[in-house]
């Protein structure tokens, strides 16, 4: 049985070189699909590249590179988790991409 995936988990996904931050909510993730953003180690001045630091995660979440990933057909492993305050900042940045005003 596969692990339950939570918003804020960092995954290593088969055939994807960068770690992926799960940004979708837990109820959505129960489908076996997740929406996530890659975490790159290169610094950037973009307001949509948000730095995250935790025990084993150090990089920049690229909020504009949202991807729908089907974990039912890909191997994956949870390799970390980011703090709630970072999850809030990242989901706010993503929501800001779609705001009307």
Language model features with spans:
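Conserved functional hotspots at enzyme active or ligand-binding sites that engage polyanionic ligands
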Residues: 1-101
